[in-house]
Every structure is written in C-alpha cells, then in structure tokens.
Amino acid sequence: MALLYAPQKKQKTTQKIVAEIQDLDYQGLGVAKIQGKTWFIENALPTEKVEAVVTDEKRQYGLATAQKWLQESSQRVEPQCRYYGRCGGCQGQHIPVEMQRKAKEKALFSRLSKLQAEPIQLMPMICGEQWAYRRRVRLSLLWNAKSKTVEMGFRQKNSNQLVSIQQCLVAEQAINDLIPKLTSLLAQYSAPKQLGHIELVSAENGVAMLLRYKGNLAETDRTLLLEFARVNAVNLFLQDDQNIQLVHGEMPYYALDDIRLSFDIRDFIQVNTRLNQQMVETALDWLDLNQDDHVLDLFCGMGNFTLPLAKRVKSAVGIEGVLDMVKKAQANAQFNHIENVEFYQADLDQSFSEQPWSKQHFNKILLDPPRSGAAFALNALCELGAESILYVSCNPATLVRDAEILRSFGYRIIKTAMIDMFPNTSHLESVTLFIK
C-alpha cells in the first residue's frame, strides 16, 4: 500500500532587525540605514534604538514596526487618544507636533528644490490646532450578536475589525457631543442588523447626520430618528439602497470669505475649517489678484476657491468633473450674487480642446487636483500661456511629477508652503506658485 506524502507547511518566521533611527520622514516613520539599505520604521523617532519586526522588504528599502525600545527619545510624547495604535485614523500622536510639521516641510522643500537651480522661497507653514480640527467623521456600525449591542467606531489599522469609540480627539466638539447620544439612540433601534454607517458633518447651521441602512425602515425607527434630530438640532439624512433623503432640517453650509457655500452631506469638502480658510486666503494673496484678471480654477468642486477669487477679478471660470458639483457651484454663485463666474463640467483626464471655456484667455490658473494629480490637464493647460499657476496639492509625489511638466513649459517655482491640514496623520498638503 502506497503512502501519500504530504509536506508539512513551513512555519513563517518573524524577521527582526535592530535599528538606530537617524531621521523622520513626512509620514511619521523613523528612517534608519542598515548595511546600505534604507528602513522605514513605524513608531520610531530620531535618536532611538529599536528592535523592530519586518513587515515588508524590497531590494532597496524595507518596512518594519518598532516592538522594543533599546534607547528611547526624550522627545517622545504620550498619545492622548485611548484608541491610538488600534484605530487607523492617526499615525503620529507619539511625535511632537512641531517635529511632525518640520518633517513634512522638509520633505516638501527638498523634493521641489531638486527640480531647479534657482532658489525657492519656503514660506511659513500654514498650521492650526493639533486637536478638534475635523468637521467630518464616518462611523462604522456593527451588530454584536454576542453582547446584543450595536458597536460604533472606526476600523482598526490594517483590518476590517471595529474599534468602538466614545470620542475622537481630532473631531470638532460638536461631533463629540453627539457620539454618546448616538450610542443611546442605536440601543433603541428595532432592526440593528440593518444599520450600515453614520456620517457626521459639523456645519455653520448645526451638525448634519447621514444614517445608512439596508432594507426597509420601520416606522418606529423613523420616529425615533426624527425625534433625535429634533431634540439635538441635527440636519438628518437617511440613505437606503437607492437614494439619500433629507428628512429633517436643512442642507448644510459653511461660510468662507463672507460667502455661504451649501453642500450635500456626501459632497467633498475640506474637513479642516480653519485651515481651509487660511489656505484660500494664501491662494488669493499669492495669485496677486486684481480687477483685470481672468482666472481659471480646475477641479473646483462647488466653488471653494472659485467664488472667493471671483470677487476680486474681472472673470472666473471653474471646471469640475462631477456634474452634480458643478450644479452646486452654480447655485452657490447665484445665492451669493456673484455674476462674473461660470462653471463647466469636464473630465480633466480627457481632451478638452473642444470645450468652449478652453478658447478663453486666462492669465492666471489655480488647480486643486485629487491625489492622482493633474498630469494630463497640465500638458494641455500650459498651452494657454497663463503667467502664473497656483497648485494646491494633497500628494507630494504627484506634485513633483506635475512640477516637472510645468518646468518643461517654462514655468519656475517661486514659492511653496506646507499646509498641516491633518495633524497626527501621514498626509502632506501644500501650496506652490509657478510663474512663467
């Protein structure tokens, strides 16, 4: 009788390294060199010596997570959030905020400085509060069959598991005030398995709340939700499998430069209220606007930059890929009696040479693209010959790529500034001015 051979599975061994941290990258990772290879180590600060578990290793670099501190930095701070390390929202609460900011600013300036020999002005970083800055959060909901309770919170880091929370230190106070009340509300819900998630947005006219649910909403639950919205002055939206409906209150809006900008609860808005105001003010100042200017705003959304700048120039045109956002921008212009602005829908990753707006003359351009950048659009827009281009970036890698395109068309980088839009996280926002 033949015996079948079944090879035993190899046990996956955990590789560890000992590293002396020399620097901090903009994402909050400690940087070390071991035998010529660069390692990026999570939860490690400059001057620290750590034992770290390898999570990924490539030919030229490796990733690891500090597990044991053989030498600890005196600058390390105790994370204020009780969920830090489990919740996936923040990555840098153990890093002093000034160290976070300097690492981001250094990364931005060093990358741009490599593109040209001429000096670039590094302007003062645009900063705000380290805590209570987010006006939007999304809370996942999960029915725990064992405890027979609805859990509410954020996803764990690198996982779909839920971390139940009672507060979020980076969220605005108006949002935190609602979280315990939501916990009580959901405990009374008759069909908890139908619950999907909750989105909260702190607006000028109160908190807007979206509840996503599956199936049909029981009348008792609808009454419960409406009473909650009434008592807590919440603008309530309900979303089933097909559509979103405002069932109590009014559409949310925020104020900017004496302008009222209305938006739908699912629309993209800048989540840091104060930093958005500073960012827009900086953009308007750097473009040095006057009443003879004709300005083009790309990826304009619902007019966050377009409408404030339109008040200062002869004419403004905003271009946005999402038609619904274009309609909101038009409505916002009409509500605020701004008549020298036009908005158009266009896919800026496709040729727009036949679009009517592309035939107009623009002497100044502003763009605020997504993380993927604006490579296609810039190749076409540089043909318009604008004297200055202001680029708002949320990704330093695509900023550098796009800056090289602008350089090839004769534009020079004049100045740049880091925007600390999301303290305690790995995100790096910036604003950069190019002149021809």
Swiss-Prot record:
It is an enzyme of class 2 (transferase). The active site is at 394 (nucleophile). Keywords: 4Fe-4S, Iron, Iron-sulfur, Metal-binding, Methyltransferase, rRNA processing, S-adenosyl-L-methionine, Transferase. It holds the Pfam family tRNA_U5-meth_tr. [4Fe-4S] cluster binds at residues 81, 87, 90, 168. Coiled coil: none annotated. One of its GO terms (molecular function) is rRNA (uridine-C5-)-methyltransferase activity. Its EC number is 2.1.1.190. SUPFAM superfamilies: Nucleic acid-binding proteins (SSF50249), S-adenosyl-L-methionine-dependent methyltransferases (SSF53335). It catalyses: uridine(1939) in 23S rRNA + S-adenosyl-L-methionine = 5-methyluridine(1939) in 23S rRNA + S-adenosyl-L-homocysteine + H(+). Residues 10-68 form the TRAM domain. S-adenosyl-L-methionine binds at residues 270, 299, 304, 320, 347, 368. It comes from the Bacteria. One of its GO terms (biological process) is rRNA base methylation. Catalyzes the formation of 5-methyl-uridine at position 1939 (m5U1939) in 23S rRNA. Belongs to the class I-like SAM-binding methyltransferase superfamily. RNA M5U methyltransferase family. RlmD subfamily. This is 23S rRNA (uracil(1939)-C(5))-methyltransferase RlmD.
